[in-house]
Amino acid sequence: MASLTHIDAEGSARMVDVSDKAATTREALAEGRVAMAPATLELILSGNAKKGDVMGVARLAGIMAAKRTHELIPLCHPLMLTKVEVEVVPDSALPGLHVTARAKTTGQTGVEMEALTAVSVACLTIYDMAKAADRGMRIEGIRLLEKSGGASGHFRAEPPTD
């Protein structure tokens, strides 16, 4: 079993020293969903939500959050992100919105947390902007889908089994 890199020999939390790691291109893709009543999805898609453009604001919130990940998660390194892309897509089968975020950098540590933070905050923003219409919305399935670059190599998540 792999050891926890953020815990030292005495069991104390620490920021990992990445000084000796080579800078490589790193990319991560994460996803999440906001399930809601069909009428709420219809309201969002119509552009008539009281707080405005739910999907557009959620995209911007996700991008902004990715850039501030190191301020939100105590042991994350501040990264110079070269790309953050957040997509919010309607899913009538859910019903709700499917959110994906892709983060990219060239550096000494990965961007998984930035992609996950972008998805999380985008989903929270959707909830905040539509909660007046539907307090029963559910944020679901936030997970890392794929990562590449770095010493640990490539990772691709298995399809969900639910």
UniProtKB/Swiss-Prot annotation:
BP GO annotations: Mo-molybdopterin cofactor biosynthetic process
UniProt keyword list: Lyase, Molybdenum cofactor biosynthesis
GO molecular function annotation: cyclic pyranopterin monophosphate synthase activity
Matches recorded under InterPro entries: MoaC, MoaC_bact/euk, MoaC_sf, MoCo_biosynth_MoaA/MoaC, Mopterin_CF_biosynth-C_dom
Annotated catalytic residues: 128
UniProt KW Transmembrane keyword: no
Documented EC number(s): 4.6.1.17
Catalysed transformations (reactions): (8S)-3',8-cyclo-7,8-dihydroguanosine 5'-triphosphate = cyclic pyranopterin phosphate + diphosphate
Pathways involved: Cofactor biosynthesis; molybdopterin biosynthesis
Keyword set includes Lyase: yes
Functional description taken from the UniProt entry: Catalyzes the conversion of (8S)-3',8-cyclo-7,8-dihydroguanosine 5'-triphosphate to cyclic pyranopterin monophosphate (cPMP).
Assembly behavior: Homohexamer; trimer of dimers.
Family: Belongs to the MoaC family.
Protein name, UniProt field: Cyclic pyranopterin monophosphate synthase
Organism encoding this protein: Xanthobacter autotrophicus (strain ATCC BAA-1158 / Py2)
Gene: moaC
